[in-house]
């Protein structure tokens, strides 16, 4: 990423339409065309940030104890009034993302078809918000991560494939799998990221999704989970785990990329339990996941595997307006420069999301 000096940005209807050198702009007599000149007086414009791992269904407010998200979502989606209220909240959260400097989000698990609906409302100018690449509901398994809340619980390969047809009808932009458990799913020390989804299901969904033209993102928080995901066709690893040579080789063999998410595990790993209300097991496993994500990011960067950033907003302690923290954590814990962190959250994110021709630089 290099700073470009002496540039002119043309904006029409609140959209950047062109960026050109000041010398060229001077030849075009833009004022005569109705443009108003705003001199930034030496300031810089940063490309819009790209948050590659978002759940629009949550505000990040920590709970004193775990709640039954499956029951809560079932209640919310059970009638028109509560659904309308929930959609209004989701719209507000997307607006928060935009006003915090995030101009593109990639949603990887949400309520029903809310995310694609909002994507289209924003594109049509009906709602303010960032560009959205939407997966809608993810695919999990009974007892799996987020099952019944922002992901369906597929009891068989057939059910998982049926959901792909629903997702296609909703015109999603990508598919999301929940392959392993998460920090709060593990009931014993040392086993966060337990494999929940059978490799056969992962492969079946990836094969069909690819045939439909979709990329597949997968929640994985253990070395075994990462390897199962990559071996069976997953395109992006969300979170990651401690890397070894086999894992790195699989990333390269399958041209996959890593979405680093330091924000969700950090509170459980580093905050005092009196603040997080976490159990000793949750704190221990939070640290395992946090260290694994850091290690995976470092290994990926060292081996030229593409890395993007997401903050897993919706998880406890992560708000819809603090994606900037993820960049700081990336710098502090992975050891990258500020410049590289900005590059990762702009240009690299745009490239991996397939929108590098319209944003990111």
Regions found by a protein language model. Name each.
Residues 211, 215, 281, 291-361:
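His/Asp/Glu-enriched, well-ordered alpha-helical/loop segment
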Residues 1-46:
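Histidine-rich, glycine-flanked metal-binding segment
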Residues 9, 14, 42, 50-53, ...:
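Divalent metal-coordination and catalytic microenvironments
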Residues 117, 159-178, 183-258, 274-275, ...:
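Histidine/acidic residue-rich metal-binding segments in metalloenzymes
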Residues 44-121, 145, 200, 232:
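Metal-associated gating/positioning segment near the N- to mid-region
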Residues 58-86, 136, 141-147, 183-196, ...:
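Active-site gating loops and adjacent loop-to-helix segments of metal-dependent hydrolytic enzymes
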Residues 61-63, 115, 185-188, 226-232, ...:
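Histidine/acidic-residue-rich catalytic or RNA/ligand-binding cores of hydrolases
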């Amino acid at each position: 990423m290099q700073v470009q000096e002496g540039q002119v940005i043309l904006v029409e209807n609140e959209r950047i339409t062109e960026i050109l050198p000041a010398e060229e702009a001077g030849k075009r007599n833009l004022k005569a065309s109705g443009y108003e000149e705003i001199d930034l007086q030496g300031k810089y414009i940063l490309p819009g940030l790209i948050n590659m791992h978002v759940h629009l269904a949550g505000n990040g407010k920590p709970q004193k104890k775990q709640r039954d998200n499956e029951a809560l979502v079932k209640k919310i989606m059970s009638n028109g009034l509560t659904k309308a209220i929930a959609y209004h909240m989701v719209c507000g959260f997307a607006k928060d993302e935009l006003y915090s400097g995030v101009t593109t989000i990639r949603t990887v698990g949400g309520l029903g078809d809310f995310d694609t609906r909002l994507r289209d409302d924003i594109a049509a100018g009906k709602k303010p918000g960032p560009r959205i690449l939407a997966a809608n509901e993810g695919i999990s398994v009974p007892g799996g991560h987020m099952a019944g809340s922002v992901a369906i619980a597929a009891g068989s390969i057939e059910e998982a494939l049926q959901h792909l047809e629903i997702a296609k009808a909703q015109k999603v932009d990508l598919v999301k799998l929940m392959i392993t458990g998460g920090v709060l799913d593990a009931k014993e020390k040392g086993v966060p990221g337990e494999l929940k989804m059978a490799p056969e299901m992962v492969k079946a969904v990836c094969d069909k999704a690819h045939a439909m033209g979709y990329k597949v993102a997968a929640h994985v928080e253990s070395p075994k989970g990462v390897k199962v995901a990559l071996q069976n066709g997953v395109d992006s690893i969300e979170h990651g785990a401690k890397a070894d040579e086999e894992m790195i080789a699989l990333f390269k063999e399958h041209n996959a990329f890593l979405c680093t998410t330091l924000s969700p595990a950090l509170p459980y790993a580093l905050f005092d339990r009196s603040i997080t209300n976490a159990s000793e097991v949750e704190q221990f496993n939070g640290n395992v996941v946090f260290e694994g994500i850091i290690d995976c990011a470092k290994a990926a960067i060292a081996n030229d595997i593409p890395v993007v950033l997401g903050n897993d907003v919706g998880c406890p302690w992560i708000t819809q307006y603090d994606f900037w923290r993820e960049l700081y954590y990336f710098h502090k814990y992975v050891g990258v420069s500020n410049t590289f962190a900005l590059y990762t959250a702009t240009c690299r994110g745009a490239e991996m999301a397939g929108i590098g021709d319209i944003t990111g630089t």
